[in-house]
């Protein structure tokens, strides 16, 4: 029964479905999103569209909790995993590329980093990629389709507004049509 299945995602404490609860139902265990920094840039920061960045984005590309880009992915993963396990002892992981625009780069670099991230630990169950609407291409779509066949894949698409005037005000670098 669809309604019954849907209601199973709610808890007695919360009348909405949290991501934590969704993951527990999907994977059967606590899931940690390990925020990795692939040392990507952003076309709204590197001069392609602008060098100012969006008004809400920090110097670290809003990846303030991601790993240090000067460290290897292995070291970033290990350090963040150890920190998470100080609070929660058991769980599996989603490799999370959060900082900057993680589909903005040569396709070979993207493929290498994403595939490497999936191999960092035997308990990685998925990949989460943060990006923006104007950084997709047919090659990116093909790569995402390949990754989706291999693992649980989510794309975080930064949609800050549906109003062109607001997008311009916040220096988003694209319009609603994008």
Regions from the PLM with identified roles:
Residues 5-94:
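N-terminal [4Fe-4S]-dependent radical SAM core
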Residues 87-174:
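Conserved SAM/AdoMet-binding glycine-rich loop
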Residues 177-178:
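Conserved C-terminal portion of the radical SAM core fold
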């Amino acid at each position: 029964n669809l309604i019954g299945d849907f209601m199973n995602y709610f808890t007695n404490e919360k009348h909405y479905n949290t991501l934590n609860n969704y993951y527990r139902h999907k994977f059967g265990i606590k899931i940690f999103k390990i925020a990795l920094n692939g040392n990507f840039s952003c076309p709204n920061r590197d001069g392609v569209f602008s060098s100012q960045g969006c008004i809400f984005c920090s110097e670290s590309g809003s990846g303030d909790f991601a790993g240090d880009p000067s460290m290897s992915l292995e070291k970033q993963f290990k350090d963040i995993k150890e920190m998470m396990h100080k609070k929660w002892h058991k769980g599996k992981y989603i490799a999370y590329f959060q900082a900057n625009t993680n589909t903005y780069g040569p396709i070979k670099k993207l493929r290498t980093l994403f595939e490497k991230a999936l191999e960092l630990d035997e308990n990685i169950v998925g990949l989460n990629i943060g990006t923006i609407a104007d950084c997709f291409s047919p090659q990116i779509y093909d790569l995402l389709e390949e990754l989706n066949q291999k693992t649980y894949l989510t794309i975080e698409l930064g949609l800050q507004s549906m109003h062109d005037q607001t997008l311009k005000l916040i220096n988003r670098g694209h319009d609603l049509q994008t």
